[in-house]
Amino acid sequence: MTFAVNEAMRPGLRTGMRVMVQLGARKFYAGIVSRLHDEPPAYKTIKPIVRIVDEREAATPEQLRLWEWISSYYMCPPGMVMRAALPAKLKLDGYSEDETLRSGYRVPLVPHIGLHPAVGSEEQLHAVLDSLSRARTQHRAVVEYLARAGFLPGEEDDSRSPEASPAAQYPAGDLPDGEIPVGTPGKGGFAFGEAPLVPRAALGVSSAVIRALVERGILRQVDLERQPGGEDSFAVEGAVIAPLPVLTDSQQQAYEAIRSGFAGKEVVLLHGVTGSGKTEIYIHLMAERLAAGGNVLYMLPEIALTAQLIERMRGYFGDRVVVYHSRLSDNRRAEVYRELLASQGGRLVVGVRSSVLLPLPHLSLVVVDEEHENSFKQADSAPRYQARDTAVVLAGLCGAKTLLGSATPSMESYYNALCGKYVLVALTERYSGVSLPQVLLSDTLRAARRGEKRSHFNKLLLDRIEEALVRGRQVMLFQNRRGFSPFVECGNCGWTASCPDCNVTLTYHKSDGSLRCHYCGYHTPLPPRCPSCGADDLQPRGFGTEKIEEALAEIFPDAVIDRLDADTSRTAHGYRRIISAFERGQTDILIGTQMITKGFDFGNVSLVGILNADNLLNYPDFRAGERAFQLMMQVGGRAGRRSEQGAVVIQTGQPSHPVLAQVCSGDYEAMARMQLAERQSFLYPPYCRLISLTLRHRDRTLLWEAANRFGDSLRRVFGRRLLGPEAPPVDRIRGQYLVRFLLKIEKQSSAAEAKRLLAGLFDTLHRDKAYRAVELIPDVDPQ
């Protein structure tokens, strides 16, 4: 959108700055200036910019160009890209201009205050504050601040701070009688928490008001000792900078090959087997770039991986290390963003998918570890970007180099290397010289026929677990499904518990006796009897990590067993507790979902068990073979990483499956040849581009009418390249029905032209009032 700039504002306005604009009669929003020009738009009325929010830019030129590319390539409005890139504290959402704002009063731009859970409504807070002396003006300030901060019902607001407020910014003396921790709002009430301190004066209230609120239990006063450093801080005071790790001969050769590759190409793919020491090579490359004054971005697929690596990176690079992920507080994310925006180089940014959207001036190197992981793809909401591919584009915009690393590279990256677009560097030896783990297949059908199965475990796996425990070794077991069982069924009438808003069965979680939907979050207690026939015969079917944990505890009662999945690691503390205990040898057996496959380095693990390989092999997707190989090789690579060869036991009903043969031999090249040949025959990536198109609406009949009409229009333009419409495996989520199309675009065809045609055809459909409420969700390069 185009807005007018008045003469007084013009000298101080630059691209990348945040400005406030008015949309509608009383709504104000913030945007970022992407271009300054004197070309009049097609529409007549041009609204003026209300004010400039900051004195300096909030985005770099490279960021703006990257956002523009993301918007165009991933078919997403530029405003949504901006919202994804900016930390919450740097966004100014729409708010209504009310009497308070018109009179000049502004909500203080400071962090939220934590309230006691007993204060559950605005009326209660009004009553308390009204009883205080001098309460009238202060009552208004506090209540309106809390409402705008999200603790109490109120209008949309612009109370998110444009400047972060770090804990060390204000001394304790600025606050009455000690320090007051600030908190975060909880669902349905208020919860105590911790966040940066704020000066009492910033709220415009007296010490008496604060004391009265504390006495009445609304606020809680806690004296805190300021802690330097920490996982998400910039500096580690007194940190010892360790010498760089010594590279083995094979690592040194790979390091030199990467440097040579960068001389001729922008991207290098490092294919190193599990345990080969890719991280040591990364460290040497990072040190070289940091010493030259450049910034380095080190991207990981999961938050779960950051804890182990951050400690290690800080040992080498000290306070140059910056951490960025979604579990940081809003204030911390804003602080990191501001710090990087002003950076003059020499920073190592360790982050997950969203870190590619940070301001990174003087960017010199991007390292994407475990580049094959599909968690680099944003799938749940727009912009649906692939962070690995976006990182390659970002590096190109900044004149930086990109290193992609994996033991099992994605077919897309491997194909690019085979075609000469990337340089391929191989690292085939393990760091310690230990052989890759021995892989054993255990036939579940044969074990059942012979009576060699107990619970969900074949005799071979149980024997190996017992042997490892006797020798004081640790075991990791992989089951790619959390919960106790996938569904509950009535043994009398066949009734199954289903989600009322999604077309899926509810997963039974025995720990809290609940049935949960893993799509929308709906949960309900397990009924004592069948709601359909009244029989007392509800049976859990299938098995998840929780059920595996219970069964193992019965078989090995003396073993210490723990579980790492989305349920047990909802908080950073829960995750760290589980990993730390296993790392210190306090846990004998660790059961987990895909979280345990991601690059962990535990020296005492001698055995890895994969409980159900068939679920991976039989998944209805053209990438199933590739992903099954990657998962099994990655989780298997956790075994035997130090002084002795480990073992991997894979339970399967298909022991002759070709992918399992490739896993047993560790033959990535054979797997890649097979997968690439199949995809070339049936025209799938990397031999074409894919765009998934999902239509969504609450009325199933109307949705299919719209889908058939849209499909006819698409087929007239794209012909046989269009697949669908079809219902996805889960065709209703959160009360909305789904219909999908898949569009194939040949490499030689223009993807931009195809996207332009798609947008035009959907606009035509939307012009029909009957289908105006039907949503289109495009997903470019779906995973």
Where are these regions (language model features)?
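Accessory, non-ATPase domains that flank or precede helicase/AAA+ motor cores in DNA-metabolism machines
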Residues: M1-S406, L418-V434, V717, L742, ...
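A carboxyl-terminal module marker
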Residues: D712, R716-Y737, L776-D779
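Inter-lobe coupling/hinge segments of SF2-like helicase ATPases
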Residues: A242-T248, Q252, G264-W704, D712, ...
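A general secondary-structure junction signal
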Residues: R35-H37, L86, D223-E225, Q479-R481, ...
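Helix N-cap motif at beta-to-alpha junctions
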Residues: R698-R700, K744-A751
